[in-house]
Amino acid sequence: MKTLLLTLVVVTIVCLDLGYTLKCNKLVPLFYKTCPAGKNLCYKMFMVSNKMVPVKRGCIDVCPKNSALVKYVCCNTDRCN
């Protein structure tokens, strides 16, 4: 009985995500990835000339500054990019 209880506890810990992990969309929003530790922002990168089509999406630790050619949009909730 103790073994069964211990097994259930271990399975619960493995199945539940005890630490917070962020999920960010990949280039195609149907797919996402779980961000590694330390990367706590999702980002979407656009070319300034065409803001409708994102060039890149993913996980990042610090939101980069926008430039004359590239614009970044960062957020910190699951699949927000």
From Swiss-Prot:
Q: Write out the entry's keywords from A to Z.
A: Cardiotoxin, Cytolysis, Disulfide bond, Membrane, Secreted, Signal, Target cell membrane, Target membrane, Toxin
Top-level division of the source organism's lineage: Eukaryota
Which organism is this protein's natural source? Naja atra
**SUPFAM superfamilies referenced in this protein's UniProt entry, alphabetically:** Snake toxin-like
This chain belongs to the protein called Cytotoxin 5
* MF terms in GO: toxin activity
Q: List the disulfide bonds.
A: 24-42, 35-59, 63-74, 75-80
Per UniProt, subunit arrangement is: Monomer in solution; Homodimer and oligomer in the presence of negatively charged lipids forming a pore with a size ranging between 20 and 30 Angstroms.
Q: Where is the signal peptide?
A: 1-21
By sequence similarity, the record places it as follows: Belongs to the three-finger toxin family. Short-chain subfamily. Type IA cytotoxin sub-subfamily.
Query: Mind telling me which GO cellular component terms the entry cites?
Result: extracellular region; membrane; other organism cell membrane
| Chief site of localization | secreted
Entry's localization field: Secreted; Target cell membrane
GO BP of this protein: killing of cells of another organism
Q: In which tissues is it expressed?
A: Expressed by the venom gland.
* Entries under Pfam families matching the protein: Toxin_cobra-type
The record describes the protein's role as: Shows cytolytic activity on many different cells by forming pore in lipid membranes. In vivo, increases heart rate or kills the animal by cardiac arrest. In addition, it binds to heparin with high affinity, interacts with Kv channel-interacting protein 1 (KCNIP1) in a calcium-independent manner, and binds to integrin alpha-V/beta-3 (ITGAV/ITGB3) with moderate affinity.
